[in-house]
């Protein structure tokens, strides 16, 4: 298995979730045990040598890679969720979308002062969701060690939004 083979498995769905969008669908990678395992192993390899305490990931697709990666690396996992989905006291961060705003939440006790956190998501597009996730980690006193993605849509320039963070992406479109 290679990253090029993983890239070829990611299919493009036209006009989803709305007209004009070419959605990158990772579900073929997820359903193929060898491809999914290889993806997690390559994400883990990209983080070799780094010292961090936690992996945080935004819902929903960030969970698909963040939780197994945390398990593989023997660190804790912190879910970053949409409003009203976490049961304990939360901190919220509102961010801009193409049409309006959205927000994400994190438990107030999820990250301790000085803990180093890697943020994981399936795909870097505009960077808004991950930027909000990073700001939530930092608001709790955490240090964003790096941000890692399986895939990146380079034409959307999401890295600009994340300027100043160490960004890793394995597959670029």
From Swiss-Prot:
Pfam families: Pribosyltran. GO terms for biological process: adenine salvage; AMP salvage; purine ribonucleoside salvage. SUPFAM superfamilies: PRTase-like (SSF53271). GO terms for molecular function: adenine binding; adenine phosphoribosyltransferase activity; AMP binding. It catalyses: AMP + diphosphate = 5-phospho-alpha-D-ribose 1-diphosphate + adenine. One of its GO terms (cellular component) is cytoplasm. HAMAP family: Aden_phosphoribosyltr (MF_00004). This is Adenine phosphoribosyltransferase. It comes from Thermoanaerobacter pseudethanolicus (strain ATCC 33223 / 39E). The gene is apt.
């Amino acid at each position: 298995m290679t990253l090029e083979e993983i890239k070829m498995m990611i299919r493009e769905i036209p006009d989803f979730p709305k007209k004009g969008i070419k959605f990158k669908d990772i579900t073929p990678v997820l359903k193929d045990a060898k491809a999914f395992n290889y993806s997690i192993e390559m994400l883990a390899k990209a983080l070799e040598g780094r010292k961090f305490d936690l992996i945080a990931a935004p819902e929903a697709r960030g969970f698909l890679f963040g939780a197994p990666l945390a398990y593989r690396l023997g660190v804790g996992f912190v879910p970053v969720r949409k409003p009203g989905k976490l049961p304990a006291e939360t901190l919220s961060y509102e961010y801009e979308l193409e049409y309006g705003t959205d927000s994400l939440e994190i438990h107030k006790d999820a990250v301790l002062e000085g803990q180093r956190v890697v943020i994981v998501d399936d795909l870097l597009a505009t960077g808004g969701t991950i930027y909000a996730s990073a700001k939530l980690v930092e608001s709790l006193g955490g240090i964003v060690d790096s941000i890692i993605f399986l895939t990146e849509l380079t034409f959307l320039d999401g890295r600009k939004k994340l300027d100043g963070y160490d960004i890793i992406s394995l597959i670029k479109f």
